[in-house]
């Protein structure tokens, strides 16, 4: 999957696109231009990846179980390929923060909460955190573990909880249609 990089130094900011968008969405919508002072001054290095939403939760022809399987493949791609790519492009001690809006917020929140040992924080903007509305009533363990509204209240692993507490999490919401 394609990935785009902006900047040379600073903490790593991994951007996940909204709904059915791609890795260049934030450039097209001028968000990269707004971040330019931080990118150009070496405060952050931005990475943006493609989404798989049309191959999973937003694909109405796909069964719920297959949507969850595809989501897990995306999660593993981020953890096993994108995070090492970012670490190689920065340094192994450079913090990684992940952000997105809409479905990108879901991915950002989910990826951080599941692996706070790899991702240091998340900025989740106007996200949907309950995936059951995208599964036509299908619900299993895989849907549960990708739907933060369901699994977080039951999270009891003290090591993971402590890492989440040490991380940074910003949940931003708004009003209106978008």
Language model region names:
Residues 1-178:
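Non-catalytic cap/lid and distal C-terminal segments of serine-dependent acyl enzymes
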């Amino acid at each position: 999957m394609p990935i785009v990089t902006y900047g040379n130094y600073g903490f790593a900011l991994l951007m996940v696109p909204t709904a059915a968008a791609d890795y260049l969405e934030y450039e097209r919508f001028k968000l990269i231009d707004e971040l330019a002072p931080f990118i150009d001054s070496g405060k952050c290095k931005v990475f943006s990846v493609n989404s798989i939403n049309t191959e999973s939760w937003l694909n109405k022809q796909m069964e719920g179980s297959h949507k969850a399987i595809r989501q897990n493949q995306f999660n593993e791609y981020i953890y096993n390929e994108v995070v090492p790519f970012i670490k190689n492009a920065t340094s192994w001690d450079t913090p990684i923060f992940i952000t997105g809006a809409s479905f990108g917020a879901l991915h950002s929140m989910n990826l951080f909460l599941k692996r706070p040992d790899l991702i240091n924080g998340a900025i989740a903007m106007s996200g949907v955190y309950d995936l059951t509305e995208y599964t036509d009533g299908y619900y299993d363990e895989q849907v549960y573990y990708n739907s933060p509204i369901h699994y977080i209240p039951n999270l009891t692993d003290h090591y993971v909880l402590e890492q989440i507490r040490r991380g940074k999490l910003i949940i931003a919401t708004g009003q209106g249609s978008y």
